[in-house]
C-alpha cells in the first residue's frame, strides 16, 4: 500500500509586525499546517494532507492510505506601546515608546490519518490552537502594575472520524481535549506624595498553574458538486478550562526605605492557592475552492470566532479573597477572510495567500496584558514532493503580519 507521508512540514512564520500596541487578534493560533498557511490558511475546501484533522476533518474520508504530518511554526511577535495621554501621571508619557521583550514561540503540529475502508477515514492530532506570550521589562515598563509577563500555553488533542456516502459528500465528527496552563506576573507600586515617593516597586505577584483539561467537539462537511469545485465547512466548539489548582505567590521588593519596607511587610499577603477561568471561543469556517486548470487551485474562506465567550479574566484568591479581582474584557465575535492560490509544477507547489483578521477586543480592553488590533497577513509557500514514489513532502511558508495601530486606555490601580 502506498503510504503518503508529510515530514517536517516546516512553517517558518516570522511575524513581521509593525510597531504597535498589538500582537494577534485575541489569542488564537491558526498556523496549524505549512501547506495551508502558504495559502494564508485558505484550505477549508482544498486541504489534502493530514492537517485536515484541523482544517477540515471531512476530507479524511478522501485521503488514501496512512499519512503522518510533523511540523510547527516559529512565531516572533513584535509589540510596542506609545503614550498618547497628556494628563498628569499618564503612562507612558506622551510620545514615549516602550518595546515588548522579543520572544520566539514554536507551537507544534502533529497529525496522523488512516483510511479504514473506502469512504471511511480516521485522524488524530496534537496542536496548539491558542496561546499568548507577552513579556515587558519588569523594572522599567510603565505598565508593570498591569502585567510584566503573560504565558498562556495550550495542547489540544483531536480525534475525528469521517464518512463519505458517495463521491460528492463527506461528513466528519470528533472530540477535542484541550490542556491549558497559565502564568500571570505583575508588580504593585507605592506612591506617597507627602513623602516625595512615587512609583516604588514593593510587591511582585505571580500566579501559575499546571496543565488543566477542558473538552469540546468538532464537525465538518465537504461537498464536491463538480470536478473543479469543492465546498467545505467546519465547526469547533468553545472550550472552557476551570483552573482550580493555581498558586499565587507574593514576593516583597525591598526599597531601602525602612518605613516603607516595614509597611509592606505588614500588608504582604501570604502565598496561597488561587483559581481562574480560561475561555476559548467556538470557530466556524466555510470555504470554496476552484481549479481553473488541472495545476491550479484557488480558494476563499470566511471564518467566524465566537470571541464573546471571553467576558472577563477572574483572579480568585483563597486565603485573602478580598484581594481577588476580575478584569473585564467583553470581547466581541469577530471574523476573518482568507484567500489563497496554489500552482503545481512537477514536484513543486508554489503558494500565495492574503487574509484580513478583525480584532475582537474593544478599545478599553486593549492593554499590556492583551495587546490587540486588526491585522493583515500576506503569505508565500512552497512544497516539494520527493522519494521513490513521491510520497514524502516538505512544505515551508513565510507569513508577514501588518497591524493597525490601536489606542487603548487603562486606569492606574
Question: Which residues make up each language-model segment?
Answer:
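N-terminal plug
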Residues: 61-62
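Bacterial N-terminal signal peptides that target proteins for export
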Residues: 1-10
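A beta-strand signature from Gram-negative outer-membrane beta-barrel systems
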Residues: 55-56
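Outer-membrane beta-barrel porins/channels
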Residues: 23-37, 44, 65, 81-83, ...
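Bacterial N-terminal signal peptides
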Residues: 9-19
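Short strand-turn segments of transmembrane beta-barrel domains in outer membranes
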Residues: 42-44, 67-77
Amino acid at each position: 500500500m502506498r503510504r503518503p507521508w508529510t515530514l517536517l512540514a516546516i512553517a517558518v512564520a516570522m511575524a513581521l509586525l509593525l510597531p504597535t500596541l498589538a500582537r494577534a487578534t485575541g489569542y488564537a493560533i491558526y498556523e496549524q499546517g505549512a501547506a495551508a498557511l502558504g495559502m494564508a490558511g485558505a484550505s477549508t475546501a482544498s486541504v489534502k494532507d493530514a492537517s485536515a484533522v484541523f482544517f477540515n476533518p471531512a476530507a479524511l474520508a478522501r485521503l488514501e492510505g496512512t499519512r503522518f504530518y510533523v511540523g510547527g511554526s516559529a512565531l516572533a511577535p513584535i509589540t510596542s506601546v506609545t503614550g498618547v495621554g497628556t494628563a498628569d501621571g499618564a503612562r507612558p508619557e506622551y510620545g514615549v515608546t516602550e518595546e515588548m521583550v522579543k520572544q520566539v514561540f514554536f507551537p507544534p503540529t502533529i497529525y496522523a490519518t488512516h483510511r479504514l475502508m473506502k469512504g471511511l477515514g480516521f485522524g488524530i492530532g496534537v496542536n496548539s490552537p491558542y496561546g499568548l506570550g507577552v513579556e515587558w521589562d519588569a523594572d522599567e515598563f510603565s505598565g508593570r502594575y498591569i502585567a510584566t509577563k503573560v504565558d498562556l500555553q495550550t495542547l489540544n488533542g483531536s480525534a475525528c472520524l469521517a464518512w463519505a456516502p458517495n463521491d460528492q459528500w463527506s461528513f466528519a465528527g470528533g472530540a477535542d481535549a484541550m490542556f491549558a496552563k497559565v502564568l500571570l506576573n505583575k508588580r504593585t507600586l507605592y506612591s506617597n506624595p507627602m513623602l516625595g515617593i512615587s512609583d516604588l516597586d514593593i510587591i511582585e505577584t505571580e500566579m501559575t498553574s499546571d496543565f488543566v483539561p477542558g473538552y469540546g467537539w468538532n464537525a465538518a462537511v465537504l461537498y464536491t458538486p463538480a470536478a473543479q469545485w469543492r465546498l467545505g465547512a467546519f465547526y469547533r466548539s468553545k472550550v472552557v478550562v476551570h483552573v482550580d489548582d493555581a498558586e499565587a505567590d507574593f514576593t516583597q521588593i525591598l526599597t531601602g526605605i525602612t518605613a516603607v519596607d516595614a509597611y509592606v511587610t505588614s500588608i504582604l499577603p501570604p502565598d496561597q492557592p488561587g483559581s481562574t477561568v480560561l475561555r476559548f471561543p467556538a470557530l466556524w469556517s466555510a470555504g470554496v475552492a476552484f481549479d481553473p486548470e488541472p495545476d491550479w487551485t484557488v480558494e476563499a474562506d470566511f471564518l467566524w470566532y465566537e470571541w464573546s465567550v471571553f467576558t472577563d479574566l477572574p483572579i480568585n484568591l483563597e486565603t485573602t479573597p478580598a484581594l481577588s479581582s476580575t478584569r473585564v474584557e467583553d470581547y466581541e465575535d469577530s471574523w476573518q477572510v482568507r484567500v489563497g492560490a496554489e500552482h503545481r509544477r512537477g514536484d513543486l507547489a508554489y503558494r500565495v495567500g492574503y487574509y484580513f483578521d478583525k480584532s475582537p477586543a474593544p478599545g478599553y480592553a486593549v492593554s499590556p496584558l492583551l495587546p490587540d488590533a486588526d491585522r493583515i497577513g500576506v503569505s508565500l509557500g512552497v512544497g516539494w514532493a520527493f522519494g521513490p514514489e513521491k510520497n514524502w513532502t516538505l512544505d515551508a511558508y513565510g507569513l508577514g503580519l501588518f497591524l493597525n495601530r490601536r489606542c487603548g486606555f487603562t486606569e492606574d490601580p
